């Protein structure tokens, strides 16, 4: 195989595509990727022994093998293959990026579109330079729409992913302080995320946007094919979970979700707007949103034997931390407790942002305890003697196990592994 067209024919005839020899099935296409700690190009013989029919590799030993597409850069070839596959598709593709809420928004859009169409979508948060191509290559001939999440922690990454995915509809959820170590500044975050809208502008796609967010409004200022989020309003409720109302030209609707946190109303607005754009009936949209249950530590409410716990432990940066604390503080519950994991990739903002969080905790009424995990918090231990500090999540288990009758916010990044504390609560 010498051309991308020949490789594409091999891809279409293969039983599946794999980048892991442990998951190879008979007749699959194996793409050998090189990472920081592994190089799958050294495992070609094993891949073929396990049943691979074709392979993409930079291993010169297999350059003349007719089953092999030889290339100096297997990742770029994977991306080129995904882009070529995308070019063969005539279905709507929804692209999503943003600092916070993109995975929940992706999940909500997916369930909404799935209520009417056969929908392909990003699995989990496979939203990077490898995950986006794999998502695109998972789109089958009978799929009617696709939803593609795009993440980034360095400048230029969204532009590259959007050029591969070529979305017909796209949205940026928001912009905030995250991955500053990679982006360099908040402006760097804005410029990177805005690339999704620039891609839509270049192809005539539809830009969906939050008209309440000035940063997002600035991104689409010079574009005509824009659709603002449908208006929605929170419905006051004693329930822990979010309820809201919205209306179209004919009717008003009330939706009761399984999501914790008022900030999720924006994610729901995005899903409703995209659903309407794609022709999904309001009744189906509402039922899909009401039927969605969050997983993987995102906006979940748990009642344990001893405590009520809000679990938001998959992603943490200053803006998402503030949103979670705003929602937590607004609840009328007594005997509150926070368990927070340190935020990563903040560069020069690491110290001031963690200090801001600690100072914020002092102002929360009815806060009985604060358990802080990670060195970025612990460096301020002397200034906050009433708080408990631990270097690692495992070190906090004993303190956590003593909590009873508390209303608890468990907030951090997936790298904090705060989910390991749930059984102790």
Model-based region annotation:
Residues 1-80, 84, 260, 331, ...:
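N-terminal leader/targeting and accessory segments in enzymes
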Residues 35-38, 295, 313-386, 413:
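Active-site beta-alpha connecting loops in nucleotide-dependent enzymes
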Residues 69-73, 387-396:
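Short acidic-hydrophobic, aromatic-tinged amphipathic segments that line or gate anion-handling sites
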Residues 77-211, 215-223, 332, 406, ...:
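Phosphate-binding loop of NTP-binding sites
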Residues 96, 296-298, 415, 419-420:
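ATP-dependent carboxylate/acyl-activation modules
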Residues 163, 395-403:
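Short amphipathic alpha-helix with an adjacent loop that forms part of the alpha/beta core around
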Residues 407-423:
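Peripheral docking tails and interdomain loops at the edges
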């Amino acid at each position: 195989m010498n051309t991308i067209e020949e490789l594409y024919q091999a891809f279409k005839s293969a039983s599946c595509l794999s980048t892991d020899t442990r998951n190879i099935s008979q007749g699959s296409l194996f793409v050998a990727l090189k990472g920081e700690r592994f190089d799958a190009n050294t495992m070609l013989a094993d891949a073929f022994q396990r049943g691979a029919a074709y392979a993409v590799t930079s291993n010169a030993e297999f350059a003349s093998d007719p089953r092999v597409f030889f290339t100096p850069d297997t990742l770029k070839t994977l991306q080129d293959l995904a882009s070529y596959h995308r070019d063969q598709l005539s279905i709507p593709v929804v692209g999503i990026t943003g600092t916070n809420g993109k995975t929940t928004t992706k999940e909500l859009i997916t369930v909404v579109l799935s209520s009417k169409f056969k929908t392909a979508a990003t699995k989990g948060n496979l939203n990077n330079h490898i995950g986006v191509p794999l998502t695109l290559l998972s789109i089958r001939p009978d799929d009617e729409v696709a939803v593609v999440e795009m993440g980034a922690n360095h400048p230029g990454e969204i532009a590259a992913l959007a050029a591969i995915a070529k979305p017909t509809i796209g949205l940026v959820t928001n912009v905030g302080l995250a991955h500053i170590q990679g982006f360099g500044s908040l402006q760097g975050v804005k410029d990177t995320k805005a690339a999704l809208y620039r891609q839509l502008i270049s192809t005539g796609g539809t830009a969906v946007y939050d008209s309440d967010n000035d940063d997002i409004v600035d991104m689409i200022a010079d574009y005509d094919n824009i659709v603002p989020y449908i208006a929605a309003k929170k419905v006051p409720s004693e329930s822990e979970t979010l309820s809201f109302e919205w209306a179209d030209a004919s009717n008003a609707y009330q939706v009761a979700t399984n999501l914790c946190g008022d900030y999720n109303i924006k994610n729901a607005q995005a899903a409703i707007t995209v659903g309407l754009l794609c022709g999904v009936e309001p009744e189906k949209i509402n039922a899909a949103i009401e039927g969605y249950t969050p997983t993987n530590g995102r906006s979940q409410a748990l009642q344990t034997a001893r405590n009520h716990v809000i679990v938001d432990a998959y992603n943490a940066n200053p803006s998402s931390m503030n949103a979670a604390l705003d929602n937590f503080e607004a609840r009328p519950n007594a005997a509150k407790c926070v368990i927070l994991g340190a935020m990563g990739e903040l560069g020069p903002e690491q110290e001031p942002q963690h200090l801001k969080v600690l100072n914020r905790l002092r102002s929360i009424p009815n806060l009985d305890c604060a358990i802080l995990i990670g060195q970025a918090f612990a460096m301020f231990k002397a200034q906050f003697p009433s708080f408990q500090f631990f270097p690692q999540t495992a070190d906090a288990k004993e303190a956590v196990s003593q909590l009873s009758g508390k209303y608890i916010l468990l907030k951090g990044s997936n790298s904090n592994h705060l989910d390991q504390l749930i059984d102790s609560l």
